[in-house]
Amino acid sequence: MHAIESLIILLGAAALLAQVARFLNVPYPVFLVLGGLAIGFVPGLPALQIPPEVIFVVFLPPLLNYAAFFSSPRELRAHFRPIALLAIGLVLFTMVAIAFVVHYLIDIPWAVAFVLGAILAPTDPVAAQAVFRRLGVPSRVGTIIEGESLANDGTGLVAYRIAVAAVVTGAFSIWEAGLDFLLVGGGGLLLGVILGWAVLPLWVRVRDSSIFIALSLLTAYVVYVLAEEVLHVSGVLAVVSYGLYRGWRDPRIFPDASARIRNISFWQVLVFLLESMLFVLIGQQLRSILDGLGEYSAWELLLYAALVYATLIMARFVWFFIVPSLNPVFDRLLRNRYVQSQWQERLLMSWSGMRGAVSLAAALAVPATLSGGSSFPERDLILFLTFCAILATLVLQGLTLGPLISALRLKSEDEADKVEELETRLEGAHAAVKRLEQLDGELVPTSAQERTREQYEERIRRYEAGIEAGGTTEEYAQSSAAWRAWRRELIKVEREAVLSKRDRGEVSPEVMRRVMRDLDLEESRLEG
């Protein structure tokens, strides 16, 4: 079977598994990885080999750009301290812990042990986004975990690059490594912001939504390739900082509403396809990885995998329950007080360290030979241990995070979010009424002006009542639900009437599509 047919089968399997996961209300990465694992052992179906550059260059730029684009700079700033400590401190701590364990308990050379530690240290942004998107977690927890996963890939990959170079060349300088770490990471962050600012004139001049969408995808790849291949800084951090900058400026630089709606829809579909393919492909790699492990018994491999997984979990738990005790010291040093997380939140974040595509790509990218021509020590074992860590964290954490959230009685701050939303809508409505009074209404009938004013005044009254009630009252929620159901029924009847007119040949397809688009937009607005 050719690669194209295999790819089509995998896409179909990914869509089916994602639907099953949605039906069972579990994070879909779990089903996709397990499904890929099963598909990998189907006789006659060739396993698609993933070159590491495919993950780094094809998958990561759009996925990181999407995650950063929809992140909140305000929330990331508010939780900058824990995110920075996790993205740098926890990555280095985990790398050292893994290296220590595999060196002394598995007898792997120090330099190679640090390579494995650097591979497994960063959490995966794709997995974090995919899992937390479906779970109702407090915004503080979601912001910290997603911010950590966005930033720590850059830290982990820079450390990985240094560790691999030390193994291949046999030379290592801690001062050169530290300087390289700062230049590569800081250079990537700075480059992303500079490129985001530099392409602003391009976005302002684009008025075609199709071109806008195509360029929004292309620029994510350009940023990554320019960072990695030309300037040799962190492409991951460059794309993240670029995505954050774009997300902040986008509503102003491209004011066309229909283009923004199409852009978001395009990215949602693209991200779903890329995530689905990525998790299925991860699961499919085990068969080829096992081929190079003939010198180890099954019990040895399982024991080594369990040791590495336990070290990952313990390092994260130790960090989350020890480092926060240093907050008073950081408060004095930074002259800024940060409110410490509750123990329930720390327990949840300790259990949220999923590994994924970035770790697998890094393991696959380990060179086969050293500079002298000899084989890279324990490369096959590194691949196996990396795969097992990815599988264990995705499946075990993915299946148990939901029950853990319920057991800890952690809830998302829906009421606070609702109040913030109502306050924002209220401010917009007041601005519209103020502008309405300033506009020249000579060309607009007085009756239409009054109807518009009454609509805005009714919105203001409802928003103020909701804010006073602290979000949404039960009566308001019931009446809103009833009104939405009532309005959906009317839209359904409208749609049927339009289709009947089309079926009778009384309206052109183009006119029918325009009317249906308006009805679809109105119905989608009811969904929130």
Show the residue positions of the predicted features:
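Transmembrane helical cores of multi-pass secondary ion antiporters/exchangers
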Residues: M1-V419, H430, S479, L499-G528
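Cytosolic C-terminal regulatory domains/tails of membrane transporters and channels
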Residues: L410-G528
